[in-house]
Amino acid sequence: MNMRPLNKILAGAILITCCWMNLANATLINRGNGMIYDSVQNITWLQNANLSGTKMNWEDSLAWADSLSVGSFDDWRLSNPDPICGLAVYNCTVNELGHLFYNEFGLTQGQGVSSLFSGTNANFNLFINVQASVYWSGAEYAPLTASAWYFNTKTGIQSAGNKQKGLYYGWAVRDGDVVAVPAFRSLAIFGLGLLGLAACKRQGRQRAKLGAV
């Protein structure tokens, strides 16, 4: 029996599945329309890290993020800090922007994003207008409610600043992805299983015929 058609179908299904899974395993995915999905944190970043074009105090920055409508989504916010990590501390990777800084951009303590401006860092180059400066987080600093958390992309430090006097940048995010998770992955794996089972059965029948000769 000619197995070539089945083998071609099987090879094609494997190739398609591998391509999809490589995309699914990517940490940062450009979803288009100015949005970058972070599959590890399950949040979507604005591609433009300075969409407002100006520094703002904390309350204005909150209001700016809340008023955004990008890609038909209007549930934007400022990034979350990591209060447990502490004040004036490096390597706070539970901080959403800290995770991006250390884990996705691969930067280290005291190393700023300016070191990536002219480089070939693929993750960093997904974004535009990233400032080597201070970005507000979306939460107050509980021990001193006149202050709010921020993250400094010039040094990688998490700290807090006065909500009214501090003029920093805002970088908006939203929870979750901006596209529906496709069912193709499950269907492809199921299809591969069926193709593999069919191939095994055909090979078994061929061996049985040969053994009967």
Indicate residue ranges for each PLM-predicted region:
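Bacterial N-terminal signal peptides that target proteins for export
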Residues: 2-11
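Bacterial N-terminal signal peptides
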Residues: 11-19
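Sec/Tat signal peptide C-region and signal peptidase I cleavage site
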Residues: 20-26
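Extracellular adhesion/carbohydrate-recognition regions
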Residues: 27-77, 167-173
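An exposed tryptophan-centered "aromatic clamp" motif
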Residues: 62, 66-73, 81-150
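Short, structured beta-strand segments at or near domain termini in extracellular proteins/domains
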Residues: 162-180
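A short, hydrophobic C-terminal helix/tail in secreted or cell-surface proteins
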Residues: 182-201
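C-terminal membrane-anchoring or membrane-association module
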Residues: 198-213
